[in-house]
Amino acid sequence: MDSASVPHRIPPEMPQYGEENHIFELMQNMLEQLLIHQPEDPIPFMIQHLHKDNDNVPRIVILGPPASGKTTIAMWLCKHLNSSLLTLENLVLNEFSLTATKAKRLYLQRKTIPSALLVQLIQERLAEEDCVKRGWILDGIPETREQALRIQTLGITPRHVIVLSAPDTVLIERNLGKRIDPQTGEIYHTTFDWPPESEIQNRLMVPEDISELETAQKLLEYHRNIVRVIPSYPKILKVISADQPCVDVFYQALTYVQSNHRTNAPFTPRVLLLGPVGSGKSLQAALLAQKYRLVNVCCGQLLKEAMADRTTFGELIQPFFEKEMAVLDSLLMKVLSQRLDQQDCIQKGWVLHGVPRDLDQAHLLNSLGYNPNRVFFLNVPFDSIMERLTLRRIDPVTGERYHLMYKPPPTMEILARLLQNPKDAEEQVKLKMDLSYRNSADLEQLYGSAITVNGDQDPYTVFEYIESGIINPLPKKIP
């Protein structure tokens, strides 16, 4: 870049490359690791960190009172995410660790081990290859604020913390029916989760310390400690109610651990709204443009502007409009390229609607480098679309727009003179809907990370869903 040439304009490909390859997050993670470990020679340390390629592996802590189901949820998450499960019991059973041997003796005597020894065990275990490569889930650790602070001091930072919660009366009752499979460690319940196989039923054992009094004492100790542990994990902690079916708890936990936290990475929204005619794309685009100062790029409007301005492309487009034919994709993309290449689109971002209508247009859009970083499908039932569009009317005298159901004219005189736009005729709408439905499956497959929104609700509710999808990072895809 020539220092004498001002102002500098950064090519749009540069921030797009950084965003697609998560360059900012990569640099942020390396800086965090440098500050935590403070190596004497940073360069080899950073190279080693890059070789590990484990910035996005699961690092999860699951906490909760006795009988909340945290071990079950942790085991299910481990199977789904292919991560390593760390519990107090399996940490002390590590046969290849002298620290674990010492901790095991203390654990057999007292059923607890000192915090310093526990944290040392965790540190040793997390350094092993399976935890480094595949990530880890801590079940029920840390139990106290002292343990939480010791873990943080060593630079062990979870990405997600889940706290299960349920009324004490429910937990006490649930704990009485708890049973354990001694071979697999799986936890069952006499009422809620009884195994169908008679072989497993016969070998189930009643765990120790599950009486009502003992459970109440454990709950009292848990409540005393958890209020001091929670402040150690601001912004990464989610409380989930355990007073619901275990499968529901699991899916809420899985959804949370697959989410990404917001970062300070530069982000220029490039939003694509897809959906059938009448799904509300234009309204949502206008709301986004108004609130976030995005450039509202409507494909149909661009074509009309090109004709009105009598540009070269406008003259080529005009015959298609006169004959009511679809504009050639090549012409369409040239008009669109001119608009998206302007500085306001590059600097502020854009919200595009009206294109692509099919897979060919989508591939053309991508080949030109206009890759959206947020794609939304607005789903609206066929009957709702017909109701929205076929009942629209316009007053030829005042130009006022009406809807026979949602915004009827105030007088019979006005009603009598209302006209319907030919494009809102039932047959025309059905043709457009049929075309949209035929192409939607291909577009959904192409835009795999797209977010589907129910468009058949209040427009501002729809806007809130779209807004949330733009502001928050996209969830991780677990293979």
From Swiss-Prot:
**Residue segments, region LID 1:** 177-206
Instruction: Print the keywords alphabetically.
Output: ATP-binding, Cell projection, Cytoplasm, Cytoskeleton, Kinase, Nucleotide-binding, Transferase
Give me the ranges of the annotated region NMP 1: 87-113
For the region Adenylate kinase 1, give the residue spans: 58-258
Q: Which is a Gene Ontology cellular component entry for this protein? A: cell projection
Which superkingdom does the taxonomy of this entry point to?
A: Eukaryota
Q: What does this protein do?
A: Nucleoside monophosphate (NMP) kinase that catalyzes the reversible transfer of the terminal phosphate group between nucleoside triphosphates and monophosphates. Has highest activity toward AMP, and weaker activity toward dAMP, CMP and dCMP. Also displays broad nucleoside diphosphate kinase activity.
Q: What class of enzyme is it?
A: transferase
Oligomer status and interactors: Interacts with CFAP45 and CFAP52; CFAP45 and AK8 dimerization may create a cavity at the interface of the dimer that can accommodate AMP.
Q: What is its EC number?
A: 2.7.4.3, 2.7.4.6
Does the entry feature the keyword ATP-binding, yes or no?
yes
Q: Which family does it belong to?
A: Belongs to the adenylate kinase family.
Q: Which organism is it from?
A: Macaca fascicularis
Q: Which SUPFAM superfamilies match?
A: Microbial and mitochondrial ADK, insert 'zinc finger' domain, P-loop containing nucleoside triphosphate hydrolases
Chain spans, region Adenylate kinase 2: 269-471
Q: Which gene encodes it?
A: AK8
Question: Which residues of the sequence carry a binding annotation for ATP 2?
Answer: G278, S279, G280, K281, S282, L283, R392
Q: Which reaction does it catalyse?
A: AMP + ATP = 2 ADP; a 2'-deoxyribonucleoside 5'-diphosphate + ATP = a 2'-deoxyribonucleoside 5'-triphosphate + ADP; a ribonucleoside 5'-diphosphate + ATP = a ribonucleoside 5'-triphosphate + ADP
What lineage does the source organism belong to? Eukaryota, Metazoa, Chordata, Craniata, Vertebrata
This protein is called Adenylate kinase 8
Binding annotation for ATP 1:
A67, S68, G69, K70, T71, T72
Question: Which annotated residues bind AMP 2?
Answer: M325, A326, V327, G354, V355, P356, R357, Q361
- Ranges for the region named NMP 2 are 298-327
GO function term, MF aspect, one: ATP binding
Residues that bind AMP 1, according to the entry? G140, I141, P142, E143, Q147, R203
Q: Would the keyword Magnesium turn up in this protein's UniProt record?
A: no
The places in or outside the cell where this protein is found are:
Cytoplasm, Cytosol; Cytoplasm, Cytoskeleton, Cilium axoneme
Write one Pfam family the protein is assigned to. Answer: ADK
